[in-house]
């Protein structure tokens, strides 16, 4: 610290230094805090591989599928680029979901980091849109029919729905105009995600990182380099191994075999299934028998996520010290896993019922968040065991009433 | 950037392998594992029971349906 290269004090380098080298980090952060930088790495991998893929890809309905095959067979290292890009999207979502659940468990969304959380949700939304339109580009059966099903959802919006769908398609069906605008947007959006990520980081660095204890760590900070850098590096190496297993040994396990069949508007696949990372949201969409209701439920998922920091009433951040919340957190994780499983099952009994219960369970977590914080505050206040039991009983009653 | 903090003094010296910190990695592993399980078994149940329970219910339901149609 005493000896610092003078170049790091120059205007541009000082910003770099303040945020990535000498950035004060809580000394007690765990490996779970490494998923943020890992998500940044995933974004870089996706942009780099994407740029090189775009050099060989042709966004035309007659050539798109063939150009992907050309990349796989004729372009030197093309197979690696494509498999890295396709599996990289899945890796990106795995990392971001883990990052999200870490934030949820340790209360990283709580004041004063509301903006960090909200920007994170915006990034997730942008990622979902980017991944969806990216999946359309190979112009396989699942690309075409996935695009048809999902874009048609907008038709559920009253009055302007059909106009929006026509505008999205650039015509009266998913066709060449759709493919071209999706390609254009798929190239643009990652750079918007990168910009939003910088804002996410800037908002984080305004108050500093949270930590597993969820307490103010101003008195115990260490420099990002070399301590946290080395810790992140462990995660990067583990990630590289995990990613490589998919790229080199199971490159198609996360995809759908139907996407190796060229798009055919005259033949609908038996089961139209989105990519695995959309399955929980897809399950919520299908759980509601009404089309507009399903679309509204998807909207409500993101509204709930955005509202979370503002409906939270707990003074304690970390779930390590919130035993009741801890159980609800794990129930939410179980619920999301169930929704993911239901999303890829056919729409029949008993999956419909399980999906509907799991969908209610998802929103139930957000509904009880305000009550939970208040009840826990009372439990902390009343250390008397007897009173604590009565507070717990009233809490359970309120949950019962809410459920009813 | 989170205000002005006094960073802890850093001493650049030997690498972690030379500090022999890795030797402590497995120290008390049994106790640590027991403590983890003891403290988190209820959370583990809240995660596993709904997932496994729902899967078991669905499989059981489908099996019964199959048998019902068969006979």
From Swiss-Prot, chain A:
Main location: mitochondrion
Binding site for heme b b566: 99, 200
Cofactor field: heme b
One CC-aspect GO term: mitochondrial inner membrane
GO molecular function: metal ion binding; ubiquinol-cytochrome-c reductase activity
Entry keywords, A to Z: Electron transport, Heme, Iron, Membrane, Metal-binding, Mitochondrion, Mitochondrion inner membrane, Respiratory chain, Transmembrane, Transmembrane helix, Transport, Ubiquinone
Binding site for heme b b562: 85, 186
Keyword Transport: yes
Classification via Gene3D superfamilies: Cytochrome Bc1 Complex, Chain C (1.20.810.10)
Subcellular location: Mitochondrion inner membrane
Cofactor notes: Binds 2 heme b groups non-covalently.
Claim: Lyase is one of the keywords in the record: no
Single Gene Ontology BP annotation: respiratory electron transport chain
InterPro entries, A to Z: Cyt_b/b6_C (IPR005798), Cyt_b/b6_C_sf (IPR036150), Cyt_b/b6_N (IPR005797), Cytb/b6-like_sf (IPR027387), Cytochrome_b (IPR030689), Cytochrome_b_C_euk/bac (IPR048260), Cytochrome_b_N_euk/bac (IPR048259), Di-haem_cyt_TM (IPR016174)
Stretches that traverse the bilayer: 35-55, 79-101, 116-136, 182-202, 228-248, 292-312, 324-344, 351-370
Binding annotation for a ubiquinone: 205
Membrane topology term: Multi-pass membrane protein
Quaternary structure (record): The main subunits of complex b-c1 are: cytochrome b, cytochrome c1 and the Rieske protein.
Function: Component of the ubiquinol-cytochrome c reductase complex (complex III or cytochrome b-c1 complex) that is part of the mitochondrial respiratory chain. The b-c1 complex mediates electron transfer from ubiquinol to cytochrome c. Contributes to the generation of a proton gradient across the mitochondrial membrane that is then used for ATP synthesis.
Miscellaneous comment as given in the Swiss-Prot or TrEMBL entry: Heme 1 (or BL or b562) is low-potential and absorbs at about 562 nm, and heme 2 (or BH or b566) is high-potential and absorbs at about 566 nm.
UniProt similarity note: Belongs to the cytochrome b family.
Name listed for the protein in its UniProt record: Cytochrome b
Organism: Marchantia polymorpha (Common liverwort)
Record gene name: MT-CYB
């Amino acid at each position: 610290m005493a000896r610092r290269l003078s170049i790091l004090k120059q205007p541009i380098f000082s910003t770099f230094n303040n945020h990535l080298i000498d950035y004060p980090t809580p000394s007690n952060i765990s490996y779970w805090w490494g998923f943020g930088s890992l998500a940044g790495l995933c974004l870089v991998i996706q942009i780099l591989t994407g740029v090189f893929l775009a050099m060989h890809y042709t966004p035309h309905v007659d050539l798109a599928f063939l150009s992907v095959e050309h990349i796989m067979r004729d372009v030197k290292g093309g197979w690696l680029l494509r498999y890295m890009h396709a599996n990289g999207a899945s890796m990106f979502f795995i990392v971001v979901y883990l990052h999200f659940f870490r934030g949820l468990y340790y209360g990283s969304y709580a004041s004063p980091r509301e903006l960090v959380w909200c920007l994170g949700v915006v990034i997730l939304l942008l990622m979902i849109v980017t991944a969806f339109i990216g999946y359309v580009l190979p112009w396989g059966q699942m690309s075409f029919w996935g695009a048809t099903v999902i874009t048609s959802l907008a038709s559920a919006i009253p009055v302007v729905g059909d106009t929006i769908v026509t505008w999205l398609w650039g015509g009266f069906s998913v066709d060449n105009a759709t493919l071209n605008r999706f390609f254009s947007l798929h190239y643009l959006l990652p750079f918007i995600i990168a910009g939003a990520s910088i804002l996410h980081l800037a908002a984080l660095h305004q108050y500093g990182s949270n930590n597993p204890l969820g307490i103010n760590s101003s008195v115990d900070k260490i420099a990002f380099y070399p301590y946290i850098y080395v810790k992140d590096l462990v995660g990067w190496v583990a990630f590289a191994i995990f990613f490589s297993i998919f790229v080199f040994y199971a490159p198609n396990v996360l995809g759908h075999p139907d996407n190796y069949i060229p798009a055919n508007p005259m033949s609908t696949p038996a089961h139209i299934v989105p990519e695995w990372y959309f399955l929980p949201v897809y399950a919520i969409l299908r759980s509601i028998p009404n089309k507009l209701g399903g679309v509204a439920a998807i909207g409500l998922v993101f509204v709930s996520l955005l509202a979370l920091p503002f409906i939270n009433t707990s003074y304690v951040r970390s779930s390590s010290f919130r035993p009741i919340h801890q159980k609800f957190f794990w129930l939410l994780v179980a619920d999301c896993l169930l929704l993911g499983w239901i999303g890829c099952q056919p729409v029949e009994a008993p999956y419909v019922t399980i999906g509907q219960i799991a969908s209610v369970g998802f929103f139930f977590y957000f509904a009880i968040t305000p009550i939970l914080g208040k009840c826990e505050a009372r439990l902390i206040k009343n250390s008397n065991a007897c009173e604590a039991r009565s507070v717990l009983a009233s809490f359970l009653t309120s949950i019962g009433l809410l459920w009813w | 950037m989170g205000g002005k903090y006094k960073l802890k003094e850093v001493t650049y010296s030997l690498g972690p392998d030379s500090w022999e910190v890795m030797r402590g990695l497995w120290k008390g592993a049994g106790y640590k594992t027991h403590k983890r399980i003891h403290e988190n078994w209820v959370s583990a149940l809240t995660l596993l029971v709904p997932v496994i329970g729902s899967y078991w219910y669905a499989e059981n339901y489908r099996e019964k349906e199959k048998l019902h149609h068969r006979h």
